Amino acid sequence: MRDVLAAGLATATVLMATPLLLAVPAAAHVTVQPKEAPADSYFQLTFTVPHGCNGSATTALRIKLPDGILSAKPQMKPGWNVEVKTRKLATPQQAPHGKMVDEVVDEVAWRGGPLPDNLYDTFGIVVRFPDQPDRSLYFPAVQECEKGTARWIEIPSDNQGADKLQTPAPVVRLKAKSP
């Protein structure tokens, strides 16, 4: 009985893990999770780098933040240096907790590693999304490698589907907050 139970648990574990294992290699580009999030909320974005550049190890990942994000804090990663570039706003805006800001995070870069081509890793940024439900926020990503660069920066035009893009930028769709 114990052997049957152990075999059943092993089979269930493999079946549950298989979709997760297949999800990362199937992605051919830098992606972001979640794909959808509530507007006007804090959220941890997780960017996944599933491979290097044509077999070459990843040495840097740069993420450009879209307009409307007034608060952003990158994840510290052992073995990687974090760089934050800011930009001035034309007009100061009220950020979370009533604070007025005239400068926001424009780009976050992690440099170091290297991350071998046959492994994946994730990089996080906690952001405060704007109160703009039904808006898609694009996060253009540039992946620098020992030999070469991959630019995941394409943003679809109004009448173009994202599935038509060769190197799509990671995207999060904002939805209305639940009551």
Feature annotation, model-predicted:
Residues 8-21:
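Bacterial N-terminal signal peptides
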Residues 22-28:
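Sec/Tat signal peptide C-region and signal peptidase I cleavage site
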Residues 32-38:
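Short beta-strand segments of immunoglobulin-like
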Residues 43-80:
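Low-complexity, serine/threonine/proline/glycine-rich extracellular segments that form mucin-like
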Residues 88-117:
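Extracellular adhesion/glycan-binding regions together with long Ser/Thr-
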Residues 108-135:
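Low-complexity, intrinsically disordered segments enriched in Ser/Thr together with acidic residues
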Residues 134-143:
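Short, surface-exposed ligand- or partner-binding patches at beta-edge/loop junctions that are enriched
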Residues 144-179:
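Extracytoplasmic/periplasmic copper-protein system
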